[in-house]
C-alpha cells in the first residue's frame, strides 16, 4: 500500500469506511434490544397485553432466525445481481424493519419487524466483508476485512450508549429509529461506489473491472489482481 498515491489511499479509506457502516448496523441491531426490551414489555403491559416470557424470547431470537435466512439469500443474490445491490437491499430491509417497529402495536408486528431486521443483518454479514475483500489489494485484505468486526463492535457500543440516553424517557421506538441515519448514509453512499471488480470481471465487464482496480491499486497490483481473479474464475467454472 506504500506505493499507492494519495487518491488511491483516499478511495480505499472512503470505501472501507462507508461500507463499514454495514457492520455498525449489524452491531446496533444486536445491542439495541437489550435496553429496549424492558420498555417494550412495559408498553404492552399498559396496553393490556403483557408479553409472556416466550414472546419476549421470540422477539430476542427473531433476529437470529431472520439472520439465517439473510445469510442463505446473500450469497446467491450477490453472485447474481452484484455485491453493491445486495448491500443496498440490506439497507432497504433495515428501513422496512424499522418502519414496522414504528408502527408496531401488536406482538405479531413487532416479531415480523425483528425478523425483517434479522434478514438485513444476515445479508450484511455476508455482503459487506465480501465487497471489502474484493475491492482492496490482496496484501491488505485481511486487515481491512477485520475492520468489519471493529465496526460491528462499535455498533453494539453505540446501541448501549443510545439505550442509556433514552431509557429514562421510555423512548423505545426512537432507540430503533436512530439506526436509520447510518442506514440512509450507507444506501445513498453505495450509489457512488463502484461494483466489485471481481463481480464485474466474472460477468464480462472486463474494462470496467480494470478501471475499478486502478482506483485502489497500483498498475502492478492491478495486474496481479486481474491474474488472481482470472485464475479464480477458471477454478469456479471448473468446479461446475
Regions found by a protein language model. Name each.
Residues 1-240:
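Transmembrane-helix signature of 12-pass secondary carriers
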Amino acid at each position: 500500500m506504500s506505493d499507492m498515491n494519495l487518491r488511491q489511499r483516499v478511495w480505499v479509506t472512503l470505501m472501507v469506511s462507508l461500507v463499514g457502516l454495514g457492520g455498525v448496523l449489524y452491531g446496533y441491531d444486536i445491542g439495541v434490544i437489550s435496553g429496549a426490551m424492558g420498555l417494550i414489555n412495559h408498553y404492552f403491559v399498559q396496553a393490556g397485553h403483557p408479553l409472556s416470557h416466550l414472546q419476549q424470547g421470540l422477539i430476542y431470537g427473531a433476529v437470529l432466525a431472520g439472520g439465517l435466512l439473510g445469510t442463505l439469500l446473500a450469497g446467491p443474490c450477490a453472485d447474481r445481481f452484484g455485491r453493491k445491490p445486495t448491500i443496498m437491499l440490506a439497507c432497504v430491509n433495515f428501513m422496512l424493519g424499522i418502519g414496522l417497529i414504528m408502527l408496531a402495536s401488536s406482538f405479531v408486528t413487532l416479531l415480523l419487524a425483528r425478523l425483517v431486521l434479522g434478514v438485513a443483518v444476515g445479508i450484511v454479514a455476508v455482503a459487506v466483508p465480501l465487497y471489502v475483500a474484493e475491492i482492496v489489494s490482496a496484501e491488505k485484505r485481511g486487515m481491512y476485512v477485520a475492520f468489519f468486526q471493529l465496526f460491528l463492535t462499535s455498533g453494539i457500543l453505540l446501541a448501549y450508549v443510545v439505550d442509556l440516553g433514552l431509557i429514562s424517557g421510555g423512548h423505545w421506538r426512537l432507540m430503533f429509529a436512530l439506526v436509520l441515519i447510518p442506514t440512509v448514509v450507507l444506501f445513498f453512499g453505495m450509489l457512488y461506489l463502484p461494483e466489485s471488480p471481481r463481480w464485474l470481471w466474472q460477468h464480462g465487464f472486463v474494462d470496467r473491472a480494470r478501471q475499478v482496480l486502478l482506483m485502489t491499486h497500483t498498475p502492478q497490483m492491478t495486474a496481479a489482481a486481474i491474474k488472481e481473479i482470472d485464475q479464480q474464475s477458471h477454478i469456479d467454472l471448473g468446479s461446475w
